């Protein structure tokens, strides 16, 4: 099995002056789950190379076993720091696509024509699309047969209540 993990390249939290990016736990936990199951994992981002990490996700109080493992695992660090360019990825080369969250995907991946086309291709091929936390926001412009892909579907993600708990309401533009 081959999984494509798509990470954000966006590092600014709207117009707040704060940094954002990938929420590290949302990369590290599934990455190790996939890898430990013998899945071939490819990591990509719009710009390729090192994606930004949301600094809050790497605070001592937010450390998880997966993050501690990541910090000791050279192969995981290399996969993360040397992401492929999203524009070079094709759905026919993978069985599924996985988008971790953090706020970053709502800016670059939701608007990226490469991301939109990739998601539409996965969906049209009957392949699994997995999105965590804020990542469902990447479906904003994804369509199926001319209608929004999410029309008539139930989608879960990070809630407005959770945003309020972390002091980010309204979500900055």
Q: How would you label these PLM feature ranges?
A:
Residues 132-134:
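Short, thiol/selenol-centered motifs that function as redox-active sites or metal-ligating centers
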Residues 129:
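Conserved, well-structured core segments that form or line functional sites
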């Amino acid at each position: 099995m081959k999984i494509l993990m798509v990470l954000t390249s966006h590092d600014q939290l709207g117009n707040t002056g704060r940094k954002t990016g990938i929420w590290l736990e949302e990369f590290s936990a599934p990455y190790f789950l996939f890898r430990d199951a013998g899945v071939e994992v490819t990591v990509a981002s719009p710009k390729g190379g090192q994606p930004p990490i949301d600094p809050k996700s790497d605070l001592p109080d937010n450390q998880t076993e997966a993050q501690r493992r990541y910090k000791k695992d050279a192969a995981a660090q290399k996969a993360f720091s040397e992401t492929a360019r999203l524009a070079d990825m094709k759905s026919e080369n993978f069985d599924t696509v996985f988008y971790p969250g953090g706020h970053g995907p709502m800016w670059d991946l939701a608007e990226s024509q490469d991301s939109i086309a990739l998601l539409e291709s996965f969906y049209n091929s009957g392949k699994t699309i997995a999105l965590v936390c804020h990542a469902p926001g990447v479906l904003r412009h994804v369509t199926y047969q001319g209608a929004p892909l999410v029309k008539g579907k139930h989608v879960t993600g990070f809630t407005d209540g959770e945003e309020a708990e972390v002091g980010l309401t309204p979500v900055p533009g």
